[in-house]
Amino acid sequence: MKKTIFLLTLCALMSLSLNAQDKHFTKITVASWNIGHFALGKSGDTKLTHSVLDFYKQTYRAYFNELNADILALVEYNPLIVNATETQAAVDAHEAILSNYRDAQIGPKYDYNCNAIFSNGIEVLRTDTVMFSKMVQTRYYLVTTMRLDGDIVKVVSTHLDWNQGENGAPYRAIQIQELIDTFKNDKYVIMCADWNTSNSPSEFDAFIEAGYDMSNHGYLGNLLTYPAGSSPRSCIDNIITKGFAHSNVKVINNAMLSDHCLIKADLTKLP
């Protein structure tokens, strides 16, 4: 009898173990932020100087350390946190405030537009820069192909057109459809952006209709991310995915570091 009970218990444990293997999930933390060129969005170039560098280095480093994101997508990034002067050298932003991220994929800078992806512990296979086919300003999307737990994941950092009264919404719709078409055959996609949807979060619905999930305009409703400070009014920053479930979504508001709030979420890769 005891032998029978032992064998039944062993079989049950083996069954639980097999089920656990069949239902293996991978969870990562992803953050998306318009960092405003270290100029609070008021310029297409950094406004920080050597005299304040130590303070901002400590502040940004503490901010990113507490954030603890596996993947951090930044738009309106500035490769330099401080520009060179006649007597002092320029200061590289990755080295100064983001050196805790081993992998840095930084796209070209066009005035206000510069997209970047920082990551740790996830294999980076390649990175491509793709210009949008239709745009008012010079706009592109940065695509980093990663391998996460054996699966290929496309991670995108982008910044769509603004110009609300100058073909902004129609051009954004074209850009959104271009992204949907580009990744239609990919199982796992993570898109981080300042989508510039202004007061029209319904612009995100094209992604929903294409089978995507999202952190903003998702299960928590419309989260206001711009401008940072006491009275954000627009739902424009978002993490949009295919093949991932969203949880623990947070908006982090720090008007001293950017004119945009940061949005972060835990993403669980679905089988």
Predicted region positions:
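Active-site metal-binding loops of divalent metal-dependent hydrolases
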Residues: 33-35, 77, 158-160, 193-195, ...
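Structured beta-strand-rich core segments of catalytic domains in phosphoester-bond hydrolases
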Residues: 71, 75-160, 251-254
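Alpha-helical elements of Rossmann-like donor-binding domains used by nucleotide-donor carbohydrate transfer enzymes
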Residues: 58-62, 143, 174-178, 202, ...
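Surface-exposed cleft-lining segments at the edges of enzyme active sites
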Residues: 44-49, 127-133, 159-170
